[in-house]
Amino acid sequence: MRLKFQFVNKQAWIISMPAYLFLALISFLLHSCAAVSNGDIPESRQNRIISNIPFYAQEDYQCGPASLAGVMNYWKIDVTPDDIAKEIYSKSAKGTLNIDMVIYPQRKGLIAEQYSGNMQDLKKNIDSGYPLIVFVDYGFWAVQSNHFMVVVGYNEDGVIVNSGKDKGKFISEEDFIKTWEKTKFWTLLIKRK
């Protein structure tokens, strides 16, 4: 069996069933909340870090609730990832919707602003004591592998994040921007009123 995909420019590509199944398998394996990091923070760099942000290791598909719990507890709102997931986790999406990431902290009395960020803004917020939740995409081609993480610091070479099961992991600026730009630099700033 062959599947035929037609594109707007009238070109047609033929993908054999084995190739289609391979793409489907890759899509399945690259699920929401995939976490990738570059490793430890380089020792020789001057790091700017907000050190007292609570860390919650994420469970499967729970990067949104884990990220929100860390930032909200930083602002002294006592919630757990499980509390948050009960209210905003979507089983059908196997994750958390972006809009729910904004609405949930607002319902708990915090200011939550979602916008398209940049590195300068990210650094300014970290310097001011505001951790940011960012939405990145580790996927390739048409396959998305979305993930929320908390930016807790930076240095001249990259960012320091709480992501997945990793607290304070370093990601080079180049790698970070490649994944962040795929989401149009989705950024969530949460702060007290």
Stretch-by-stretch model annotation:
Residues 34-39, 94, 152-193:
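Noncatalytic regulatory segments and standalone regulatory/sensor domains
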Residues 111, 115-164, 169-170, 192:
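Active-site-adjacent substructure of cysteine-protease-like catalytic cores
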Residues 70-78, 87-91, 104-111, 125-129, ...:
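Structured segments of extracytoplasmic/periplasmic soluble domains
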Residues 101:
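Compact soluble domain cores
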Residues 16, 30-94, 98, 119, ...:
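Active-site-adjacent structural segments surrounding the nucleophilic cysteine of cysteine proteases
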Residues 2-31:
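Sec-dependent bacterial lipoprotein signal peptides
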